[in-house]
Amino acid sequence: MTDLSDIRREYTKGGLRRADLPQNPMQLFELWMTQARDAELSDPTAMCVATVDEHGQPYQRIVLLKRFDDSGFVFFTNLGSRKAQQIAANNKVSLHFPWHPIERQVSILGEAQPLSTAEVLKYFMTRPKDSQIAAWVSQQSSKLSARQVLEGKFFEMKAKFAKGDVPLPSFWGGYLVKPSSIEFWQGGEHRLHDRFLYTRQADEWVIDRLAP
């Protein structure tokens, strides 16, 4: 077994105090996202999306956040993917933003709701053309005999859609994750980290400090 117990560091970038918290967690998330971008973090919009299959087995993968507002968090994916199939059976999901360089994490629990075709199309048309074509190529989570199969199909579809717009695939969509709770974690000295949990109750958010 490889021993990693000596890998550690102190957290020194500041604390989080209840007096500084807005009543709406989305305001704090927007501030932290802005600060993550200003700090030039690599992929600040990258989040871990966790789902569960019919046997209770959890799965995780990194997906890019594409939009957020008071209603929730939006991401897009292939509707034939493992994550989409699991969401169809159980739409309770967890999102996690690991902003290690600025000693912060955000963890979100909620339910994923499918976006309308109009909402999906609006985003799809903003993607680079090669990314639009790639959406047609990949049968996400299916087995491939070789990478050449994927590349061959990409160039085939690229020739097919050489002229004009790339249409939206019927098997490509998106989700709005409506949060039921949002936890903000700020690293603290001596491992005395600051954790605040916002829990949705009716039309209000209840705030609790959690032990580190």
Swiss-Prot record:
Keyword Cell inner membrane: no
Pathway: Cofactor metabolism; pyridoxal 5'-phosphate salvage; pyridoxal 5'-phosphate from pyridoxamine 5'-phosphate: step 1/1; Cofactor metabolism; pyridoxal 5'-phosphate salvage; pyridoxal 5'-phosphate from pyridoxine 5'-phosphate: step 1/1
Single biological process term from Gene Ontology: pyridoxine biosynthetic process
Cofactor (UniProt): FMN
Residue positions binding substrate: R8, R9, E10, Y11, K66, Y123, R127, S131, R191, L192, H193
Residue sites binding FMN per the record: 61-66, 76-77, 82-83, 105, 140-141, 185, 195
Bound cofactor: record note: Binds 1 FMN per subunit.
Reaction(s) this enzyme catalyzes, per UniProt: pyridoxamine 5'-phosphate + O2 + H2O = pyridoxal 5'-phosphate + H2O2 + NH4(+); pyridoxine 5'-phosphate + O2 = pyridoxal 5'-phosphate + H2O2
Pfam families per the UniProt record, alphabetical: PNP_phzG_C, PNPOx_N
Main EC class the enzyme belongs to: oxidoreductase
Catalytic activity, EC: 1.4.3.5
Gene3D superfamilies the UniProt entry points to: Electron Transport, Fmn-binding Protein, Chain A
Assigned keywords, A-Z: Flavoprotein, FMN, Oxidoreductase, Pyridoxine biosynthesis
Record's keyword annotation contains Transferase: no
Family the UniProt entry places it in: Belongs to the pyridoxamine 5'-phosphate oxidase family.
Function: Catalyzes the oxidation of either pyridoxine 5'-phosphate (PNP) or pyridoxamine 5'-phosphate (PMP) into pyridoxal 5'-phosphate (PLP).
PANTHER family reported for this sequence: PYRIDOXINE-5'-PHOSPHATE OXIDASE (PTHR10851:SF0), PYRIDOXINE-5-PHOSPHATE OXIDASE (PTHR10851)
Self-association and partners: Homodimer.
Identification of the protein by name: Pyridoxine/pyridoxamine 5'-phosphate oxidase
Organism from which the protein derives: Shewanella sp. (strain MR-4)
Lineage: Bacteria, Pseudomonadati, Pseudomonadota, Gammaproteobacteria, Alteromonadales
